[in-house]
């Protein structure tokens, strides 16, 4: 599943590539991809004549702020756009990704949503396993209330609210493993299996440790490790092990730099001991028994 760095990579690509993109036509190739409104016709009508004004990210969700455009001959850059048209929210889930196409390329087998501007440039959403979802939240409704998972997210790892004091507060009485805690999106948004493993390795903390046993200095180190690992991955365009692609169709390169994730049986880059794998909270967990205590 695309995690924070992959979703942030997509967000940056969308923001750069879709500057001044006004939706003229929407084609829904798979109805189940549209999570809200329940009728695809309302989803299509809601998006038409909307400017993809600004792209944000919250955890693993992409959120596009929409502006209603009535005049096709509007001139850019736009200084004042007063008529909001709600939000387009996207969750890529396991295998979803976007591709920008500036010609009449036929849709591939796994194309789920097609969005066109008046020049017939296309933003294509492709999803092999079809778990990804999209929501059009009309003006006046709150995305946090419509989308349960969005409203329950914990703080962003890069935010001021995510520090050792916050971590100490949320884990002080928890018997769960620190790995399971990091995967909990209500505690911290955007971290998945890859970056939980890599962050714990960087911090020298065993993924099996009960969260409540982590000391203050370790929490400080863990917070810094999380931020540094995420930044490094974003700088590498995220991680591709199977389906993830950026807007240009390129793979992420962080997978070549991982220290423990998917390196079972290989030598630890620090100590030379072999990397091990075991399941925690139903997820494959990779760690170095010598470097992580």
From Swiss-Prot:
GO terms for biological process: base-excision repair. The keyword Transmembrane helix does not apply. SMART domains: Fapy_DNA_glyco, H2TH. CDD domains: EcFpg-like_N. The active site is at residues 2-3, 60, 283. A zinc finger (FPG-type) spans 259-293. Pfam families: Fapy_DNA_glyco, H2TH, zf-FPG_IleRS. DNA binds at residues 110, 129, 174. Its EC number is 3.2.2.23, 4.2.99.18. InterPro entries: DNA_glyclase/AP_lyase_DNA-bd, DNA_glyclase_Znf_dom_DNA_BS, Formamido-pyr_DNA_Glyclase, FPG_cat, MutM-like_N-ter, Ribosomal_uS13-like_H2TH, Znf_DNA_glyclase/AP_lyase, Znf_FPG/IleRS. Its cofactor is Zn(2+). Keywords: DNA damage, DNA repair, DNA-binding, Glycosidase, Hydrolase, Lyase, Metal-binding, Multifunctional enzyme, Zinc, Zinc-finger. One of its GO terms (molecular function) is class I DNA-(apurinic or apyrimidinic site) endonuclease activity. It catalyses: Hydrolysis of DNA containing ring-opened 7-methylguanine residues, releasing 2,6-diamino-4-hydroxy-5-(N-methyl)formamidopyrimidine; 2'-deoxyribonucleotide-(2'-deoxyribose 5'-phosphate)-2'-deoxyribonucleotide-DNA = a 3'-end 2'-deoxyribonucleotide-(2,3-dehydro-2,3-deoxyribose 5'-phosphate)-DNA + a 5'-end 5'-phospho-2'-deoxyribonucleoside-DNA + H(+). Binds 1 zinc ion per subunit. Monomer. Belongs to the FPG family. Involved in base excision repair of DNA damaged by oxidation or by mutagenic agents. Acts as a DNA glycosylase that recognizes and removes damaged bases. Has a preference for oxidized purines, such as 7,8-dihydro-8-oxoguanine (8-oxoG). Has AP (apurinic/apyrimidinic) lyase activity and introduces nicks in the DNA strand. Cleaves the DNA backbone by beta-delta elimination to generate a single-strand break at the site of the removed base with both 3'- and 5'-phosphates. This is Formamidopyrimidine-DNA glycosylase.
